[in-house]
Amino acid sequence: MQITLSNNLANDAWGKNAILSFDSNKATIHLKNNEKTDRTLVQQAARKLRGQGIKNVELLGEEWDLEFCWAFYQGFYTAKQDYGIEFPHLDHDLQDELLARIECGDFVRGIINEPAQSLTPVKLAERAAEFILNQADIYNEKSAVSFKIISGEELEQQGYHGIWTVGKGSANLPAMLQLDFNPTQDPNAPVLACLVGKGITFDSGGYSIKPSDGMSTMRTDMGGAALLTGALGFAIARGLNQRVKLYLCCAENLISNNAFKLGDIITYKNGVTAEVLNTDAEGRLVLADGLIEADSQNPDFIIDCATLTGAAKMAVGNDYHSVLSMDDDLVKNLFQSAQEENEPFWRLPFEDFHRSQINSSFADIANIGSVPVGAGASTATAFLSYFIKNYQQNWLHIDCSATYRKSSSDLWAVGATGIGVQTLANLMLSKSLK
């Protein structure tokens, strides 16, 4: 089916203010002459067309610019990927940008949607490294990438006790990806950013077991790792020329005779001890290892991404990623990038007093809040802050509440969204210019 854009109203026969009309084998999307609103209308129209069973389309006309093409693609995408889109001719640079968005967005959405039976912790680490290598190769930067994957008992031997503790209950070994993108080729080059991602490839909740309804989508609990991998790949596509390190903390949280238990105490590399009061608050336990490693690199800034708390989703739904940080300037930079890329982020509170709300009688901190009515997203961030020396500056925590949709909306199909890839790449690039 051919799809065109029009600034004229649809005939009332298609309904008042209809965004779609049809003529033979052609559909017309009716715009409102408002740039942001029109992008949304195009994405909504794409969803409507998919809902009508249309799988193959050709976008026709000079009105199709980069942003309209991208909006249509986002709405037309489904997890089964049983569709085809013929895009109009764009200028070379714009065509490259569109293809890079699709390449990186598809990686993120595809790997999040993938079943846990095929995406083990080690596989996630391998696939992420392979994706970055491929992206670097496309842009003649393959020699800039080096990495290692630490897995199984080697994690415990090297002091990554959080990842090991959470993942040791599964036959699929836990793993940590440590990847260095260094286009300068100078081993002593300063690090612009360290990216730390939660890569829980399946989360049963452990002995604090989830109900079936809550567990059914837990193959997506590696969404933070996927998002940061996609963002780094997209930044490379846009010409990133400074050093960035990626740390993915990968594990399965299952029940077995070897799984961790409530009351266990983890001693981290930096000497902090943490009592496990809920095995379903495992994401922060694995991220701690990554944050310690990231902090030791003395980067200009650190970003961690994780599908960390239900509290963040309760606050903002699936429509925004939640941002928590004490660094107002860095948050401002992030929101500027989000505005430029037309992606939704929302700030949630994180203050010093939250750090006193995760007390333990047996360790330095506990992995859940210790007050009767606590701010779950904020206390989770507070836990993470114990693994960054100067937690008040140059650190962004993103609770990935917009990573995945359990039900479709007028903009998105069921499944992963890819929201955030462009914003985080934009942030890295903008910081690299300062």
Swiss-Prot record:
Cofactor(s) listed in the protein's UniProt record: Mn(2+)
Keywords annotated in UniProt: Aminopeptidase, Cytoplasm, Hydrolase, Manganese, Metal-binding, Protease
Metal-binding recorded as keyword: yes
Binding site for Mn(2+) 1: 203, 280, 282
CC terms in the record's Gene Ontology section: cytoplasm
EC class of the enzyme, as a word: hydrolase
GO biological process: proteolysis
SUPFAM superfamilies per record: Zn-dependent exopeptidases
InterPro entries, per the entry: Leucine_aapep/pepB, M17_PepB-like_N, Pept_M17_PepB, Peptidase_M17_C
Binding site for Mn(2+) 2: 198, 203, 221, 282
Single GO molecular function: manganese ion binding
Active site: 210, 284
Reaction catalyzed: Release of an N-terminal amino acid, Xaa, from a peptide or arylamide. Xaa is preferably Glu or Asp but may be other amino acids, including Leu, Met, His, Cys and Gln
EC number(s) stated in the UniProt entry for this protein: 3.4.11.23
Transmembrane domains' residue ranges: none
Localisation: Cytoplasm
Family designation: Belongs to the peptidase M17 family.
Function: Probably plays an important role in intracellular peptide degradation.
Subunit structure: Homohexamer.
Protein name: Peptidase B
Organism, as annotated: Haemophilus influenzae (strain 86-028NP)
